[in-house]
Structure formats: structure tokens, C-alpha cells
């Protein structure tokens, strides 16, 4: 439980660059307010418009960016440092290979998410879908090449790939699984955890896609699921005497925030069942505490 390696490495890079001199992160480095507040406290600037970058050094977020965007930043004289998660890089490479092989690109994910924008900007005409209805609106093409946003539930991705293949049986549909392993592991662990708890607390940033998906997964197995960003959001009314409470967290959530929620929960004198803390941050194993 806690940060995955991609998020951790991105934060370390931002810390290194801020220690070396003025630096701007183009966008939210990760979708967690505690992390962003810490970066600001270290003097890191956060800007969302490339034209508004006041420093020579600029960091690309863990969610990645298109080749076109990075080339534009370099052409404007900026020194670009990529904090892109390696598994997001892998998704970019997979999509490029599919397009080079003659497949029409399709990305399964949130169209307005920064990771998805980074995937699609280099491929004009790329389709983005996140529901069966959106798949059904796609025009028929002879060949589809499919990847997904790395934090989508793999079961949902498979469902939409199957839907695409069933809708166009004469078309060739080639799917490269780009859902990251930490997401898969955490989804599996969260589902198991939710199945044996009365209440589940999901800790993560309000704009974190992988946290949102964890909430959805937990709600499929448990009727009382609450999404909170920190211990300050914990409502005693959520927990009844004798409840077994599970804790899980998004892959951009710092251990310190999770520890704070767990401490607040224990202070409420309820039984707590949380994911094992002895596992590496990139993995999740749900066990009784």
C-alpha cells in the first residue's frame, strides 16, 4: 500500500531538480494534494500552461506527455526533465507500434485525463472510449489497435475490447495490455479486502483516477465505502461499534497520509483491517492487520 514506484521516482526527480535550482512542473506531478503542497513548500512552481513557465528547467509529470508537446517545450529553449512513469512510456511505445503496423488507434480511458491526452496527441484521429455506448458509436474500420490508460481496471478494458471485436467481426482488433501491474495488484487486493470488511476507507487525491477506480471496485463488494484525502476527512459516523474497517489507498498516496488515517481510525477504538505494510510500495497485498 502507498506510492507505486513510478510516482515515487517522479517525486524524487522533482526534489533533485528543485535542489539544483528553480524548476517548474508542467501540471500536477501526481494527483495528490499532500504531495503537491510539499513540492510548493520546496519552492517548486506548478504551471498548467506551457507559455506560463517562468524557469528554464521544466519537469514533465508522471502521467507523461506527447512527443509533440515535449518537442515544443525544447524548441522554446526549455530544459525538459521527464518524470514520466516507465509504464506510461510503455503505453506510448505500444500505441506507436500499432499505428506503425497499420492499425487505427483506440485508447480506452478518460478523454480529459492528462495521460490520455499525452497518448493521443501524436496520433490524429485516435479514438478514445470508456463505455460500451462509445464503442458502439465507432465507425467500422478494417484494423483497430487498442491500448488503455494505465490505471483503468483490466476487467473493464477486456470488456470493451471484446465489445469492439463483437461489433466488428470482420475487422482485426489487436489489443496490447498497458494496464500497469501495480494497478492490477491493488485492484485485486482491494476487491478481496472489501469482501471481508463492514466499511472500507479509500485514501487518495480527489483527482486521482486510480483512487476513483479503487472506490468503484470496493463498492462492488462492500456497501459502505468512503473516499478521503487525509485523516482530516475521517467522519466518526462512518464507523459503528464492532465494525471491521479496511484501508486501501491510491498509488499516489504518501505513506504518511495513510499512517495518519490509520492512527485516527485506531483512536476511534474500532477494529481495523488494513493491507500489510511489509510489502514494497509498488505492490498491494490485503491481509488482516
What are these language model-derived features?
Residues 1-289:
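The feature marks the mature, well-folded catalytic cores of soluble enzymes
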Amino acid at each position: 500500500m502507498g506510492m507505486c514506484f513510478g510516482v515515487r521516482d517522479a517525486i524524487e526527480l522533482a526534489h533533485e531538480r528543485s535542489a539544483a535550482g528553480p524548476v517548474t512542473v508542467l501540471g500536477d506531478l501526481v494527483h495528490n494534494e499532500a504531495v503537491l503542497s510539499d513540492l510548493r513548500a520546496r519552492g517548486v512552481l506548478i504551471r498548467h500552461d506551457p507559455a506560463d513557465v517562468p524557469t528554464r528547467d521544466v519537469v514533465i509529470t508522471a502521467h507523461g506527455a506527447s512527443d509533440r508537446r515535449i518537442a515544443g517545450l525544447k524548441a522554446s529553449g526549455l530544459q525538459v526533465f521527464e518524470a514520466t512513469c516507465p509504464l506510461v512510456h510503455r503505453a506510448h511505445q505500444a500505441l506507436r507500434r500499432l499505428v506503425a503496423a497499420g492499425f487505427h488507434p483506440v485508447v480506452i480511458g478518460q478523454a480529459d485525463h492528462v495521460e490520455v491526452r499525452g497518448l493521443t496527441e501524436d496520433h490524429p484521429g485516435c479514438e478514445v472510449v470508456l463505455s460500451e455506448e462509445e464503442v458502439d458509436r465507432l465507425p467500422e474500420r478494417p484494423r483497430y489497435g487498442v491500448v488503455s490508460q494505465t490505471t483503468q481496471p483490466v476487467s473493464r478494458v477486456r470488456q470493451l475490447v471484446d465489445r469492439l471485436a463483437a461489433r466488428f467481426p470482420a475487422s482485426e482488433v489487436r489489443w496490447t495490455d498497458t494496464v500497469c501491474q501495480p494497478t492490477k495488484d491493488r485492484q485485486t487486493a482491494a476487491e478481496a479486502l472489501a469482501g471481508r470488511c463492514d466499511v472500507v476507507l479509500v485514501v487518495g487525491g480527489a483527482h486521482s483516477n486510480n483512487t476513483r477506480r479503487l472506490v468503484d471496485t470496493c463498492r462492488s463488494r462492500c456497501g459502505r465505502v468512503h473516499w478521503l484525502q487525509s485523516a482530516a476527512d475521517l467522519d466518526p459516523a462512518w464507523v459503528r461499534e464492532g465494525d471491521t474497517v479496511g484501508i486501501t489507498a491510491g498509488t499516489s498516496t504518501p505513506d504518511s497520509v495513510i499512517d495518519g488515517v490509520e492512527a485516527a481510525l485506531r483512536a476511534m477504538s474500532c477494529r481495523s483491517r488494513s493491507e500489510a505494510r511489509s510489502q514494497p510500495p509498488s505492490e498491494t497485498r490485503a491481509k488482516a492487520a
